[in-house]
Amino acid sequence: MLVNATEMLIKARDGHYGVPQFNINNLEWTKSVLTACEEMKSPVILGVSEGAGKYMTGFKTVAAMVSAMVDSMGITVPVALHLDHGTYEGCKACIEAGFSSIMFDGSHYSIEENVEKTKELVALAHAKGLSIEAEVGSIGGVEDGVVGAGEIADPEECAKITALGIDFLAAGIGNIHGVYPANWKGLDFEALDRIHKATNNIPLVLHGGTGIPDEMIAKAISLGVSKININTECQLVFAEATRKYIEEGKDQQGKGFDPRKLLAPGAQAIVDKCKEKIELFGCAGKG
């Protein structure tokens, strides 16, 4: 059974560890993430971008697939199915489709419009038992067509959005989606501390977790970050393992072309990467 993300993130905040959000793109991805989290006894948030939802033929398909897999795989750890960087329309669709959590990315609106839309979605989500994440200060880079400039969030705006009753907050602190450039200045911990103090101890979210040094992740967790999003890193190891399989000619040996065999090394690479992140975030055994 899917759960919303509120309880697992409050426990993470109070226990000073991070819950991973691993984005999923298909059945293999979902199976790999669930396998890793069950083996490590870690709670998990399965992130689905609107682009990934469309790729998997729609939010209803995703919700049905994930719910069935959690059941048929005998998963015992808490699993939330979460819309990542949702539009206003996407959030409403996921509430109806059977997701257990949503993120409304209103960071590109004026603060007034962001407040108005967030307020409405908080009421809709909570009425159906979903948790809701909101964003202030856009996250840099590109996430499935959503382009962010990498702003530092204003603590006052963060406080305004938090007061609307959201369950966790994504605040830009210099983090970006994708691979970090060589001249990246790092996370702004002073900004994170100000945001944490201004938002009444709400669980904070760190987007763009790929490529952030381990010591920065640990410091972010100590300053109130309870959820860390990983996507690009899993994509990179999946691509690398699949490429190696083909370059070694294994797809031409026997029935090596069978997609179940062809995709197996990539799927295992995702399992291994997820386990590595679970150890880093300190959430092994917390499920």
Where do the model's predicted regions map?
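Generic N-terminal amphipathic, Lys/Arg-enriched alpha-helix
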Residues: 4-20, 253-260
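A short N-terminal beta->alpha junction/helix N-cap motif
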Residues: 17-25, 50-54, 261, 265
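Extended, intrinsically disordered, low-complexity segments
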Residues: 246-287
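Alpha/beta enzyme core
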Residues: 3-15, 27-52, 57-76, 85-202, ...
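Active-site proximal loops enriched in glycine and acidic residues that flank catalytic Cys/His/Asp
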Residues: 173, 208-210, 232
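Short catalytic-loop micro-motif centered on adjacent basic/acidic residues
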Residues: 19-23, 81-82, 103, 204-207, ...
